Amino acid sequence: MEIAYCPDYRSYKKIIPTLRKYSEDVIITIDDDVLYGHETLEYLINAYLQEPEYIWFMSGSKMAFDKNGNIKPYVTWYDEHLTALECNIKNFPTGIGGILYPPHSLAEEVTDETLFMKLAPTADDIWLKAMSLKQGTNCRQIKLNKPVMRFHTGIKEVQTSALCKDNIEKNLNDKAVHAVFDYFDLWKLFN
């Protein structure tokens, strides 16, 4: 195990320094305010070994659009049905269950701290999804025979101050989606 110090990239600390140092390696991220079951890494690695062209995730949602093609608020994305076997451009990985990133699955701008801190300073999941879209890498949820929540448990003492609360309650995720997707002109991919 290696402990490395880095600038305060907020939620990006778990991936940006690692992407810079180990760009040719598989990288798995997990949230630090969750306790994970022993099988979490096994599921992610086995999925990657079978189909290495995807970003694999345990928990997520599907980006939702209205009938006019406009993105719906982030809080409604969990209302959309996400089929684990379905590979869809709208699949949106969230870090709570763990995410496996194959080498070169994210666009080269992924480590541009000036850009991600300007466009999505608190929304690493949104930035990383945009970088996968820009790179042309699809995201797939792992098919499980039991609910994902059986594999990890939140730590209540830190959940009350979790970044996701601010991102949702203050609509920071919605602002980040628009900022990042507008900047990279990613909306055209959904038409």
PLM regions: where:
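C-terminal catalytic/acceptor-binding lobe
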Residues: T114-N191
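Acidic donor-binding segment of Leloir-type glycosyltransferases
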Residues: M1-A4
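Conserved catalytic core of nucleotide-sugar-dependent glycosyltransferases
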Residues: T18, L35-T114
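A short, glycine-/small-residue-rich helix N-cap motif at loop->alpha-helix starts
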Residues: C6-K14
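Short beta-strand-to-loop acidic/aromatic patch adjacent to the donor-nucleotide binding site
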Residues: E24-L35
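Short, high-confidence coil segments that cap the C-terminus of an alpha-helix
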Residues: E24, E51-Y54, T137
